[in-house]
Amino acid sequence: MEHSRIKKRNVALIEKCVMSSIGIESLFRKFAGNPYKLHTYTSQESFQDAMSRISFAAVIFSFSAMRSERREGLSCLTELAIKFPRTRRLVIADDDIEARLIGSLSPSPLDGVLSKASTLEIFHQELFLSLNGVRQATDRLNNQWYINQSRTLSPTEREILRFMSRGYSMTQIAEQLKRNIKTIRAHKFNVMSKLGVSSDAGLLEAADILLCMRHCETSNVLHPY
């Protein structure tokens, strides 16, 4: 039994919803040979405490719809990328739009971005592929397209998103950037078009990710390889 336990790879799941955790546990049991030992945590604090005792091959963050918790999750993933570069990092997003934004604007490369809106079969397949480092060609192409789109954001557009993430209104952003309100609104709608979002909520998701991206870039300078 000890030998069998050692062979299993430890995977951490940070998920507040108990029912979701039970559902994901059942998917892990369906893997051929069940090569993983899943550890579930309801908070980042309990997960970080466990990291001092357990070596994880992969970490799965299930993002909440709450902005504050999503930002904390992104920051934790960024920190993991710096401190534990060999650990696989996966995200479970609330829907396809959030999954697309996270996949394209993530401050560091992710091994998988899954959507709760996916069918059970697709979710299970993507979970398996993400844990094993395999990517479907179509997924790579789609992700590359969104990455290319995000790179077309101008410095002004990125600043607008960062101000939005901090709670500034369009009028306040115009004052900060010394631009008229019509110009700021035009930039805003241009960003929405580039990122494929149709609401301020979608823009805020992108803004939160970009804010973490700036933190990641700073951390990489302070803590290079």
Swiss-Prot record:
<dbReference type="GO" id="GO:0005667">
    <property type="term" value="C:transcription regulator complex"/>
</dbReference>
<dbReference type="InterPro" id="IPR039420">
    <property type="entry name" value="WalR-like"/>
</dbReference>
<keyword id="KW-0238">DNA-binding</keyword>
<dbReference type="InterPro" id="IPR000792">
    <property type="entry name" value="Tscrpt_reg_LuxR_C"/>
</dbReference>
<dbReference type="GO" id="GO:0045893">
    <property type="term" value="P:positive regulation of DNA-templated transcription"/>
</dbReference>
<protein>
    <recommendedName>
        <fullName>Transcriptional activator protein BglJ</fullName>
    </recommendedName>
</protein>
<keyword id="KW-0010">Activator</keyword>
<dbReference type="GO" id="GO:0043470">
    <property type="term" value="P:regulation of carbohydrate catabolic process"/>
</dbReference>
<dbReference type="GO" id="GO:0003677">
    <property type="term" value="F:DNA binding"/>
</dbReference>
<dbReference type="GO" id="GO:0003700">
    <property type="term" value="F:DNA-binding transcription factor activity"/>
</dbReference>
<feature type="DNA-binding region" description="H-T-H motif">
    <location>
        <begin position="170"/>
        <end position="189"/>
    </location>
</feature>
<feature type="domain" description="HTH luxR-type">
    <location>
        <begin position="146"/>
        <end position="211"/>
    </location>
</feature>
<keyword id="KW-0805">Transcription regulation</keyword>
<comment type="subunit">
    <text>Forms a complex with RcsB; genetically both BglJ and RcsB are required to relieve bgl operon repression by H-NS and by StpA.</text>
</comment>
<dbReference type="InterPro" id="IPR036388">
    <property type="entry name" value="WH-like_DNA-bd_sf"/>
</dbReference>
<comment type="function">
    <text>A crytic transcriptional activator. When its expression is induced it relieves H-NS repression of the bgl operon. Acts independently of transcription factor LeuO.</text>
</comment>
<dbReference type="GO" id="GO:0009314">
    <property type="term" value="P:response to radiation"/>
</dbReference>
<dbReference type="InterPro" id="IPR016032">
    <property type="entry name" value="Sig_transdc_resp-reg_C-effctor"/>
</dbReference>
<keyword id="KW-0804">Transcription</keyword>
<dbReference type="Pfam" id="PF00196">
    <property type="entry name" value="GerE"/>
</dbReference>
